[in-house]
Amino acid sequence: MKNTSKEYDTVIAICRSLFINKMKDYGCAWRILRLPSLTDQIYIKAQRIRSLQENDVRKIDEDETGEFIGIINYSIMALIQLELGVADQPDLDVSKATELYDTKVKLTKDLMEAKNHDYGEAWRDMRVSSLTDLILQKLLRVKQIEDNKGKTLVSEGIDANYQDMINYSIFALILMDFGTKN
């Protein structure tokens, strides 16, 4: 197996740095967002990635990397919201938010390592566009679960879907050689 753990950590370090810098700029204003709002933000980013992948002409000179980073960070925020609930006002300082971020990343990385072992790193043979489609599918599932007030009969919950979106986004960035070029 390739050094997935190290590549994963490289991508997360870049995402984490951006998260911290945005916390310093804006505080934790995101704490007032309800889960459907975060899900919609992730959906916008995933749709933009799909558009960029399908269209030859771009009116804004950006690639998919920033959108995948956004999916990662918004998904981590959603996991934090699932744990803490929505706040009426920003209520976390940079240190506490970063601690929560790191906790969610560790749980998500542990999940990735377990699945990666069982699936034999099959994602390395996938196309980035397929990972985008899987993220969009997960988003549709999350929206349905949200519409069902969080209840599922036999399916995994919202948290597992957010974790999968984080991992798929990291896989996509690794496949795009992100982190090795930056």
Question: PLM ranges: what are they?
Answer:
Residues 1-182:
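Intrinsically disordered, low-complexity regulatory regions
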